Amino acid sequence: MNDSVKTSLKRTLVGKVVSNKMDKTVTVLVEHRVKHPIYGKYVVRSKKYHAHDEANTYNEGDLVEIQETRPVSKTKAWTVSRLVEAARVI
């Protein structure tokens, strides 16, 4: 009955890398839709997170998944867990 499958209790978010200019850090823009409480219209809300990128492998435009972790620095408490979709090169 008791399966030994472990699931992570850490929060995960999916967003787009908007900056990779810092060493071992990327800035990830996470957007989500929220219904306005009075008017009922869906509005796009966004927030930027600094995430740890140990190998400097992610580029601007990549769609990545970030996972909550212990604080790495003053502004970093997230780490990039995987690449969802690479940026298109035009």
Curated annotation (Swiss-Prot):
<keyword id="KW-0689">Ribosomal protein</keyword>
<dbReference type="InterPro" id="IPR019979">
    <property type="entry name" value="Ribosomal_uS17_CS"/>
</dbReference>
<protein>
    <recommendedName>
        <fullName>Small ribosomal subunit protein uS17</fullName>
    </recommendedName>
</protein>
<dbReference type="InterPro" id="IPR012340">
    <property type="entry name" value="NA-bd_OB-fold"/>
</dbReference>
<comment type="function">
    <text>One of the primary rRNA binding proteins, it binds specifically to the 5'-end of 16S ribosomal RNA.</text>
</comment>
<keyword id="KW-0699">rRNA-binding</keyword>
<dbReference type="InterPro" id="IPR019984">
    <property type="entry name" value="Ribosomal_uS17_bact/chlr"/>
</dbReference>
<dbReference type="Pfam" id="PF00366">
    <property type="entry name" value="Ribosomal_S17"/>
</dbReference>
<dbReference type="GO" id="GO:0022627">
    <property type="term" value="C:cytosolic small ribosomal subunit"/>
</dbReference>
<dbReference type="GO" id="GO:0006412">
    <property type="term" value="P:translation"/>
</dbReference>
<keyword id="KW-0687">Ribonucleoprotein</keyword>
<dbReference type="InterPro" id="IPR000266">
    <property type="entry name" value="Ribosomal_uS17"/>
</dbReference>
<comment type="subunit">
    <text>Part of the 30S ribosomal subunit.</text>
</comment>
<dbReference type="GO" id="GO:0003735">
    <property type="term" value="F:structural constituent of ribosome"/>
</dbReference>
<keyword id="KW-0694">RNA-binding</keyword>
<dbReference type="GO" id="GO:0019843">
    <property type="term" value="F:rRNA binding"/>
</dbReference>
<comment type="similarity">
    <text>Belongs to the universal ribosomal protein uS17 family.</text>
</comment>
